[in-house]
């Protein structure tokens, strides 16, 4: 069996990293696998694509994204967030034909990489792993409160459009026309995304299977907290909360508008002197937001070992997103034995078992988010149990060998008709 994974990048971004882990898992399970990308950031010979160090190619990739976004110029009042028309012709199908795989496993193929119409020219069995909602919407990657993807989109709230025949409906129509005869098998990492796909007008008749992303649990593992903090120069005498980049302040989906007031309120409580915040994914901004707590900005951590060290150094990972699939950050955290707190939405309930290995706050309830943080920290014996359960779940459900086995079964079924 010869498998080809197709992704915009190999290790740049959460979806790319999840795909690259699948590549590693399949190859470790002796499945002949390559990964075709628009932007190659690793030195892995199993990844086919031009290295990101090529200045001319970098410029070409940037130009494709800029051109892909041109139709959005007609919607100057649109909300911040990703929206992908995917209208540019591409050479991807020719590259796939040259590699001649038995089965093609699409992943995140946006940023102008793969044209919607190109899929119709793929004369290969296609398994499409969804990392967000884009494949079955009119262009948005997360629909927020909108359910127009269950019909034909149009009057798109993210475009601030009042017209039914807007860009979102045209993109939806392009997908329906191009994909209606394709024999697609859909894989989603979370049950929530599987349910959304089943409700969608585009994928309601497809085979849909849920397979969680995987993680190398020999790399993401608990490391002595004292040692981890010493290496990262973090305080030994404080409880540390971890959050991802605050660069999504303008993107309401990231939930900063819930995190900020929660931390500010905690800072005014008896816990205020005991807690500090750690932020990774960005350096300290010139005008940092007022979060109430002393904040350590660690910048981007580019390798798995540094990330494992970070998760092991903190007490809780806080994920305040209002809509999300199966974020790598939560999986990485629990693999390191660090409990997580998130709202009871999206794919979080797949990973976080309430008061067993973490805490699921009532959706968008700031008080419950605060209560959850305090509940996790206030009993050391209970905390130890949460940490043990978190690690056990990651090993049992998310190890790369398990991921590869599930995908191998799907590929075999697809090839056997």
Model-flagged regions — what are they?
Residues 339-342, 352:
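Short hydrophobic beta-strand element within catalytic cores of glycosyltransferases
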């Amino acid at each position: 069996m010869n498998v080809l994974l197709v992704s915009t990048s190999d290790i740049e971004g959460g979806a790319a990293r999840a795909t690259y882990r699948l590549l590693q898992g399949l190859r470790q399970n002796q499945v002949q696998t390559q990964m075709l990308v628009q932007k190659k950031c690793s030195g892995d010979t199993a990844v086919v694509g031009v290295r990101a160090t090529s200045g001319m190619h970098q410029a070409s990739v940037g130009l494709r994204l800029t051109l892909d976004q041109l139709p959005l110029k007609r919607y100057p009042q649109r909300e911040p967030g990703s929206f992908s028309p995917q209208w540019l012709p591409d050479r991807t199908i020719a590259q796939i034909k040259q590699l001649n795989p038995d089965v093609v496993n699409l992943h995140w193929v946006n940023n102008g990489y793969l044209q919607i119409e190109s899929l119709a020219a793929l004369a290969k069995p296609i398994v499409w792993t969804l990392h967000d909602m884009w494949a079955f919407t009119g262009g948005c990657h997360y629909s927020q409160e909108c359910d127009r993807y269950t019909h034909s989109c149009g009057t798109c709230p993210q475009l601030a459009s009042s017209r039914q025949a807007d860009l979102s409906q045209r993109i939806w129509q392009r997908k329906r026309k191009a994909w209606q005869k394709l024999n697609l098998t859909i894989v989603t990492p979370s049950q929530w995304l599987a349910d959304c796909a089943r409700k969608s007008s585009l994928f309601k008749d497809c085979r849909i299977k849920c397979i969680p992303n995987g993680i190398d649990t020999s790399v993401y593992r608990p490391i002595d907290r004292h040692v981890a903090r010493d290496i990262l120069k973090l305080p030994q005498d404080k409880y540390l909360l971890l959050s991802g980049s605050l660069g999504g302040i303008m993107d309401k989906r990231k939930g900063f508008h819930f995190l900020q007031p929660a931390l500010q309120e905690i800072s005014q409580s008896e816990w205020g002197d005991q807690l500090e915040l750690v932020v990774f994914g960005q350096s300290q901004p010139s005008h940092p937001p007022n979060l109430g707590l002393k904040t350590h900005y660690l910048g981007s951590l580019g390798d798995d070992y540094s990330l494992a060290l970070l998760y092991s150094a903190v007490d809780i990972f806080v994920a305040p997103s209002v809509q999300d699939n199966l974020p790598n950050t939560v999986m990485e955290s629990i693999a390191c034995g660090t409990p997580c707190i998130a709202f009871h939405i999206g794919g979080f309930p797949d990973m976080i078992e309430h008061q067993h290995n973490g805490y699921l706050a009532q959706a968008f309830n700031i008080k419950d988010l605060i209560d959850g943080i305090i509940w996790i920290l206030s009993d050391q014996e209970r905390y130890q149990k949460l940490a043990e359960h978190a690690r056990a779940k990651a090993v049992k459900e998310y190890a790369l060998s398990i991921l590869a086995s599930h995908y191998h079964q799907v590929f075999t079924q697809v090839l056997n008709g």
